[in-house]
Regions:
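N-terminal signal peptide c-region/cleavage motif recognized by signal peptidases
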Residues: 16-18
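Bacterial N-terminal signal peptides that target proteins for export
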Residues: 1-8
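Immediate post-signal-peptide N-terminus of mature secreted/exported proteins
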Residues: 21-52
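Functionally constrained cores in energy, signaling, and assembly domains
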Residues: 5, 44, 86
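Compact alpha-helical subdomains of small soluble proteins
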Residues: 54-124
């Protein structure tokens, strides 16, 4: 849950900055957002596989990220492709919930929280 709060905070703080630079398609922080998108996709698959019964929670977080970014069509597609890449790569790797899958979720939640925190930090 901490990851979700940090992610939502990061997205809220990024929205005004994005609105100012709406004419530019690529943002300096897009690499981090693309990685976060990939993590959200992987976590969506793995948590569902491991019976978390969260429904579409992680997909909704991805939709919130894209919405908060007010992304152009090209950026939106890149974010969605990253989400799908994360989802598909772990769908190919895991057919059942294993200890390794659960450990990967923990690693992803940690990395995602770190990315969200870095994205939320004001830049000088």
């Amino acid at each position: 849950m901490r990851f979700l709060r940090v992610t939502i905070l990061a997205l809220t703080l990024l929205a005004p900055a994005t609105a100012l630079a709406a004419g530019d398609d690529t943002k300096p922080y897009d690499d981090k957002l693309l990685r976060l998108s990939e993590i959200l996709g992987a976590v969506h698959f793995l948590r569902e596989l491991c019976g978390a019964e969260e429904g579409q929670l992680w997909r909704q977080q991805m939709a919130a990220l894209v919405e908060a970014e007010s992304a152009s069509t090209a950026r939106r597609v890149r974010f969605i492709n990253s989400f799908n890449k994360g989802y598909r790569s772990y769908r190919r790797t895991y057919q059942s919930c294993t200890t390794a899958a659960q450990a990967q979720v923990t690693r992803f939640l940690t990395e995602g929280a770190e990315l969200a925190k870095a994205l939320a930090e004001p830049k000088p």
